[in-house]
């Protein structure tokens, strides 16, 4: 218990202090976020806001995790954080270098993400060999054979990108992530991992609540998704991400629905996707979106805890 308290407060305080320094560093160099043209016009004023806070809180996460838990699972989660954080950092760097919102290409990003995912899945099989998915509420182990390796890799890449899609409104990705994982503390699953992340994200939100003075960037969002997916894949719990990553799944589905509908019907289902922009264009304030989405994330993840009881 004492270690858990230390993990949380160490993560929180480190995040608050070092992100503040990182903000000042970027302002001194006059670098910051470039807003994508296809996003809402409401966001244009955010151009130049410091970004890539993930470059601060992900290294802190790795240091805290490996200081308090040096088991093989922790090393693999740290590798996931590092690899996806680096992919995001490259993307953030290219945006700053090119002075626009275009980072690396989708093909380049997916290639790096799947390479990292294949490595992660390989080492998962060394740590905890399995080819099954545990079905929520039943505990049934659905054996997929060799197909599991591919599916698990797709899940890791998909969740990483889903968190990235959610990071489009001040405070949204951070609060939704916290709401999604807090219930895991009830069952004590990967306590050091999630206590550290909660502390770090609360520290980040100290600076990211509307109006945000810094964004997490791809370095943060891709890494958070990689951590979440890897921690579940370690034990065949990918299906539980339906509950513990519900909002991230919803955001991704909204993009798929929007693109598919426009391609085949010539009509848009939402005013803009991902879906948080739809509500933004309906007049919802950013604080309202962040609060309601994170509340929904918390409620759905609590349902996941009920299904967890069968494990």
From Swiss-Prot:
<dbReference type="InterPro" id="IPR000715">
    <property type="entry name" value="Glycosyl_transferase_4"/>
</dbReference>
<dbReference type="GO" id="GO:0051992">
    <property type="term" value="F:UDP-N-acetylmuramoyl-L-alanyl-D-glutamyl-meso-2,6-diaminopimelyl-D-alanyl-D-alanine:undecaprenyl-phosphate transferase activity"/>
</dbReference>
<feature type="transmembrane region" description="Helical">
    <location>
        <begin position="168"/>
        <end position="188"/>
    </location>
</feature>
<feature type="transmembrane region" description="Helical">
    <location>
        <begin position="144"/>
        <end position="164"/>
    </location>
</feature>
<dbReference type="InterPro" id="IPR003524">
    <property type="entry name" value="PNAcMuramoyl-5peptid_Trfase"/>
</dbReference>
<comment type="function">
    <text>Catalyzes the initial step of the lipid cycle reactions in the biosynthesis of the cell wall peptidoglycan: transfers peptidoglycan precursor phospho-MurNAc-pentapeptide from UDP-MurNAc-pentapeptide onto the lipid carrier undecaprenyl phosphate, yielding undecaprenyl-pyrophosphoryl-MurNAc-pentapeptide, known as lipid I.</text>
</comment>
<keyword id="KW-0133">Cell shape</keyword>
<comment type="pathway">
    <text>Cell wall biogenesis; peptidoglycan biosynthesis.</text>
</comment>
<comment type="similarity">
    <text>Belongs to the glycosyltransferase 4 family. MraY subfamily.</text>
</comment>
<dbReference type="GO" id="GO:0009252">
    <property type="term" value="P:peptidoglycan biosynthetic process"/>
</dbReference>
<dbReference type="GO" id="GO:0008360">
    <property type="term" value="P:regulation of cell shape"/>
</dbReference>
<keyword id="KW-0472">Membrane</keyword>
<keyword id="KW-0132">Cell division</keyword>
<feature type="transmembrane region" description="Helical">
    <location>
        <begin position="288"/>
        <end position="308"/>
    </location>
</feature>
<dbReference type="GO" id="GO:0046872">
    <property type="term" value="F:metal ion binding"/>
</dbReference>
<keyword id="KW-1003">Cell membrane</keyword>
<feature type="transmembrane region" description="Helical">
    <location>
        <begin position="74"/>
        <end position="94"/>
    </location>
</feature>
<keyword id="KW-0479">Metal-binding</keyword>
<dbReference type="GO" id="GO:0071555">
    <property type="term" value="P:cell wall organization"/>
</dbReference>
<feature type="transmembrane region" description="Helical">
    <location>
        <begin position="237"/>
        <end position="257"/>
    </location>
</feature>
<protein>
    <recommendedName>
        <fullName>Phospho-N-acetylmuramoyl-pentapeptide-transferase</fullName>
        <ecNumber>2.7.8.13</ecNumber>
    </recommendedName>
</protein>
<keyword id="KW-0460">Magnesium</keyword>
<keyword id="KW-0961">Cell wall biogenesis/degradation</keyword>
<keyword id="KW-1133">Transmembrane helix</keyword>
<dbReference type="InterPro" id="IPR018480">
    <property type="entry name" value="PNAcMuramoyl-5peptid_Trfase_CS"/>
</dbReference>
<feature type="transmembrane region" description="Helical">
    <location>
        <begin position="192"/>
        <end position="212"/>
    </location>
</feature>
<feature type="transmembrane region" description="Helical">
    <location>
        <begin position="214"/>
        <end position="234"/>
    </location>
</feature>
<feature type="transmembrane region" description="Helical">
    <location>
        <begin position="104"/>
        <end position="124"/>
    </location>
</feature>
<dbReference type="GO" id="GO:0051301">
    <property type="term" value="P:cell division"/>
</dbReference>
<keyword id="KW-0131">Cell cycle</keyword>
<feature type="transmembrane region" description="Helical">
    <location>
        <begin position="48"/>
        <end position="68"/>
    </location>
</feature>
<dbReference type="GO" id="GO:0005886">
    <property type="term" value="C:plasma membrane"/>
</dbReference>
<keyword id="KW-0812">Transmembrane</keyword>
<keyword id="KW-0997">Cell inner membrane</keyword>
<keyword id="KW-0808">Transferase</keyword>
<keyword id="KW-0573">Peptidoglycan synthesis</keyword>
<feature type="transmembrane region" description="Helical">
    <location>
        <begin position="2"/>
        <end position="22"/>
    </location>
</feature>
<dbReference type="Pfam" id="PF00953">
    <property type="entry name" value="Glycos_transf_4"/>
</dbReference>
<dbReference type="GO" id="GO:0008963">
    <property type="term" value="F:phospho-N-acetylmuramoyl-pentapeptide-transferase activity"/>
</dbReference>
């Amino acid at each position: 218990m004492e270690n858990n308290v230390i993990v949380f407060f160490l993560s929180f305080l480190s995040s608050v202090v070092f992100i503040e320094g990182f903000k000042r560093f970027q302002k001194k160099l006059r670098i910051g976020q470039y807003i994508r043209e296809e996003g809402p016009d409401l966001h244009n004023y955010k151009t130049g806001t410091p970004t890539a806070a993930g470059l601060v809180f992900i290294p802190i996460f790795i240091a805290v995790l490996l200081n308090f838990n040096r088991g093989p699972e922790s090393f693999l989660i740290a590798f996931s954080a590092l690899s996806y954080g680096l992919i995001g950092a490259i993307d953030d760097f290219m945006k700053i270098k090119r002075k626009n919102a275009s980072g690396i290409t989708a093909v380049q990003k997916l290639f790096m993400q799947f390479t990292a995912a294949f490595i992660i899945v390989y080492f998962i099989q060394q740590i905890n060999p399995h080819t099954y998915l545990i079905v929520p509420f039943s505990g049934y182990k659905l054996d997929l054979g060799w197909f599991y390796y591919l599916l698990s890799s797709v899940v890791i890449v998909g969740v990483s990108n889903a968190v990235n899609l959610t990071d489009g409104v001040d405070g949204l990705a951070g609060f939704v992530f916290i709401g999604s994982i807090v219930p895991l503390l009830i069952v004590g699953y990967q306590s050091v991992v999630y206590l550290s992340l909660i502390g770090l994200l609360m520290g980040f939100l100290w600076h990211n609540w509307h109006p945000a003075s810094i964004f997490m960037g791809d370095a943060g969002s891709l890494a958070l998704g990689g951590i979440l997916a890897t921690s579940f894949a370690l034990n065949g719990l990918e299906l539980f991400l339906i509950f513990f990553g519900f909002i991230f799944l919803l955001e991704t589905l909204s993009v798929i629905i929007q693109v598919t509908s426009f391609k085949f019907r010539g009509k848009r289902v939402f005013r803009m996707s991902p879906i948080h922009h739809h509500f933004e264009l309906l007049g919802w304030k950013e604080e309202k979106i962040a609060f309601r989405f994170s509340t929904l994330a918390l409620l759905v993840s609590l349902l996941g805890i009920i299904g967890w009881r069968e494990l």
